[in-house]
Structure formats: C-alpha cells, structure tokens
Amino acid sequence: MDIKLIASDLDGTIIDRDNFIAPENFQAIDKIHNKNIYFTICTGKSYSVAKNLCDRFHADFGIFGNGTQVIDLKNEKELIRKTLSREDLLYIATFAKRFDLHIHLYTYNELITEELKYLDLRNFKLQTLAGSSNLKFKIVKDICDYINEYNPEVFSAVISKESTLKEFFSFFNINENITYTYINKKGKYRDNIIDKEYEYLNISPTHITKDEGLTFLSEYLNIPKEDMMAIGDNINDLEMIQNAGIGVAVVDATDDVKAVATYVTEKRVSEGAFAEAINKFLN
C-alpha cells in the first residue's frame, strides 16, 4: 500500500492527558514530511485552539471541530465551514437549562458559557498553562438571551454532567439538523487537570464527522481512502479509522475503536504510540 495521507487525532493520540508529547512523535512527523506524505490533524478542537500545534507539527491540512471546518494550512485556505443555526442552538441551550446541565458553545475563536466548568474549565487551565490566548473565553449572564441577541457562529455545543447523559439521547435523536458524539473515556472522563468525573455530549450540525472531512480531502486531493492512514483513540475517531486503508488505534483507545482498527499499538500515548504506528507502516 502506498500511503499518501496520514490523519491523526490530537488529544489521547499524539498528546497524553497531561498535555505531554513524546519526543519520538516529532521524529515520526518529520519522517512523514520527508516522504512527501500529507499530514492532517483531525480534532474536535477549533482551529484557534489547535493552531499552535498545527504550526509545530507543520501539518498540511486540518479537520477541526470534528469536521465542521477543513483548512488547507499551507495555503491558509478554508475549504469547509459548517455551523449550527440559531434555532438549533436555542433548542440545545433551552434543553440544557431545563435539566440543569452545563453547556458551553464553541465559535471559531471563542468559548461561550455562563460558568467555567468541566471541559471548558479544563481548556481554560490548559491554555493558561501553555501561555496561549488563541481561544477567547466569554462569560454571559444567560446563554439563551445571548444566542437570541447575537446569533453567534457556533460549530459545536457541549453539554456536560457529573453522571450519565444516556437518558437524554432521545431528545437529540428527534432533531434531524443536529448530531452528537457521546464522549466516555474508560467509564468517566477524568484527568490530572480537572479532578472530577463527568461525561459530555459534543453536538454539531448533522452529517459532520472527522471521517466526512477525510472524504472531502479524498476528493479534493484525488487520494483514495485506501491510500490513507488514520490514527485515533475515541469514538469520534472510529469511522475514520474504520474507513481508512490503514486504521490505527492507540492501546489507550476505547474498546469500540480498537475493534475496528487494522493495528493497535503496544505503547501508550505517553510512550510514543503515535510514533510506533508511523514507524510500523512507513519504511
């Protein structure tokens, strides 16, 4: 197989939960570039949040917001941009407030919420630690009023709770305009930055996934999916891993993701799982 494009998730794949990047991962990325293979970052983060890493890795393309935005990074050209409508945002926000669920909204350069908590508090602390200010944090009094007045360009809404969110799936299933990803990392989402157990739903416009972003790049670059390699760890990586010619799951990945992978690494993320995958399939 002649690999022409390698797509990788960031958090939990190249970067571990402590925001550490194994040194060998940088060497592996250099190897990709030296072989003239396109390197694509696929992440749930917005471009404003991931830009520094994209620059650091010299990525050719970026799929951001789980597929809501695709950018040709070398030519600074936006290829795709999708957002949630005002009506759908109000639908989501009203529901969250009704059941006392935490909600925050991602625009392409802002995080909007009524209170920093859970994932958005984690992002704020990570950004503070990194000394980065690409993502602005906007605290509003009432998120529904803010949506009504300003109609922000939101690509993703995130609802969080300290217990299971599965009971709310049916509410979002009846809205054909939106789709959601249920994030559950080995039972509960917990790390060394926010010492609290919680789960979250990442809600975006319908038919938007990382894999759809790769399908677009497949057509844009005239590269068959069979000539692509995809690496990831969580449920929002599953389709791209399943549909790529070579799909790699890091050993830290969820069981569902490992079940569809061509290869599962022996090393953990902190030990250079990404580099292991690259070195196995690139001679």
Regions found by a protein language model. Give the residues of each.
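Mg2+-dependent phosphoryl-transfer enzymes with acidic/Ser/Thr/Gly-rich catalytic loops
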Residues: 1-5, 9, 22, 200-283
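Active-site phosphate-binding/coordination module
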Residues: 18-129
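Surface-exposed amphipathic alpha-helices with a cationic face
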Residues: 26-34, 97, 173, 215-219, ...
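Short active-site oxyanion
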Residues: 36-40, 59-60, 153-156, 226-227, ...
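Short, structured coil segments at secondary-structure junctions
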Residues: 57-58, 66, 175-176, 243-244, ...
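Short hydrophobic/aromatic-enriched beta-strand-loop microsegments
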Residues: 59-66, 180-181, 247-252, 266
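Conserved acidic, metal-coordinating active-site core of Asp-based
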Residues: 110-229
